[in-house]
Amino acid sequence: MMAPGWWKFVTPPAALGAALFPWSRPLSFLCLGTAAFLAFFFRNPPREPPSDPSLAVSPADGRLLGYVMEAGEASDDELSSYLDDPITVSVFMSPLDVHVNRAPLDGRVVEAEILKGRFRPAFRKDSATENNRAVLLFDGDPPFVVRLVSGAVARRIDLYVQEGDEVNKGEPIGMIRFGSRVDLAVPRSSVEELLVRKGDSVKAGETPVIRVKR
């Protein structure tokens, strides 16, 4: 499976590589290699989320950038305007990770906002509130926020959902090109157990990161 819009990026270098093949093998191979990398980047492998409704899964592939950011810190001021006393888990995506982002829980999109900002490296703490980003607020059990943050290279955020959409856990909700970070926030009062720690490798739609109260 491929992410939506993949053909717009893969087709041009693939076609150019095929056209150049009789005239210049090096340029042809360069174009075909670029097409192969882009096809790899836009891959969208199927994911099977755990059936347990109390398990919130990672919204992104990558490594855990931050274990928990306490409410009241500068990086969480924005999330505190959406949720009461949020706990946040942040995932950093490298260019080699799958970049399709997925819903961590079942819910309905009640707010979808694109916020303009800078293009600082995504691993910086201040990138969460100063970079270009998309904030998705979901009405679920519990309510939760997914924040897609662009980086120094990743400057394009595509959302697959809009306000009013119902999503299931593990369903694709967006994509950041090419790399960056995704934050998941839930109210502290709804958290029963944190299941991951800094440096852990996680997969979107599959790896449980938080157990919520039921």
UniProtKB/Swiss-Prot annotation:
It comes from the Archaea. Its cofactor is pyruvate. GO terms for molecular function: phosphatidylserine decarboxylase activity. GO terms for cellular component: plasma membrane. InterPro entries: PS_Dcarbxylase, PSD-A. It is found in: Cell membrane. Heterodimer of a large membrane-associated beta subunit and a small pyruvoyl-containing alpha subunit. This is Putative archaetidylserine decarboxylase proenzyme. It comes from Methanopyrus kandleri (strain AV19 / DSM 6324 / JCM 9639 / NBRC 100938). The lineage of its organism: Archaea, Methanobacteriati, Methanobacteriota, Methanomada group, Methanopyri.
